[in-house]
């Protein structure tokens, strides 16, 4: 039998996070980029260009520098021949997440990627976010998401309510059904509100790998 999830503690309780600067600390001003090392640089570069609508800043047989915003590069792909696949049980980064401005943009992106034969392996409402998970050609997980609440404080209040402790995974959903409801005019607040777990279902039953 699976063990029960350990209740999470929210250090910021219901007030929302306090930035390091407000706390009088010197901290990074932003997260700059991430780097993938791969033996299939061209394929990986094209995948990230497609998924993120990124453009190539600089590219040759050794590397690709990509960006989708004002940063000089958000993603770097390094060519390293002969690499072995990362074992599923290896320690390391689980996934990297990208936030969209609204549900319409997220659903449009899902449809655009589906036409490019890039489909999510996991669609889930975590509570704080509505999320689509994808795997790049090397099997690394990428999350495309929206925030379900309008502010960090609202998210913190929801998490402090105990709802996240009850279900720290979320509720899976059918993306095409979600699109149908969205196009029929169901309010976004209702579409992104996380429903309760079905009777007799564990949070761990919602995991997709």
Where are these regions (language model features)?
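N-terminal "first-domain core" detector
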Residues: 15-16, 22-65, 69
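Generic hydrophobic, aliphatic-rich segments that mediate packing or membrane embedding
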Residues: 89-92, 109
């Amino acid at each position: 039998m699976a063990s029960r999830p350990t209740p999470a503690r929210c250090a910021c309780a219901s007030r929302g996070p306090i930035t390091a600067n407000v706390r009088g600390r010197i901290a990074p001003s932003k997260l700059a980029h991430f780097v993938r090392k791969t033996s299939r640089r061209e394929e990986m570069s094209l995948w990230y260009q497609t998924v993120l609508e990124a453009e190539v800043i600089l590219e040759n047989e050794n590397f690709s520098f990509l960006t989708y915003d004002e940063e000089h590069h958000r993603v770097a792909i390094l060519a390293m021949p002969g690499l072995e696949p990362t074992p599923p049980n290896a320690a390391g980064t689980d996934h990297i997440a990208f936030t969209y401005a609204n549900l319409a943009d997220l659903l449009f992106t899902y449809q655009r990627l589906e036409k490019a034969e890039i489909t999510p392996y996991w669609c889930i409402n975590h509570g704080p976010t509505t999320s689509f998970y994808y795997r790049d050609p090397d099997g690394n997980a990428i999350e495309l998401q929206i925030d379900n609440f309008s502010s960090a404080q609202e998210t913190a209040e929801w998490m402090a309510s105990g709802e996240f402790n009850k279900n720290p995974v979320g509720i899976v959903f059918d993306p095409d059904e979600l699109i149908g409801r969205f196009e029929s005019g169901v309010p976004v607040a209702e579409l992104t509100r996380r429903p309760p777990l079905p009777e007799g279902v564990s949070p761990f039953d919602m995991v997709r790998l």
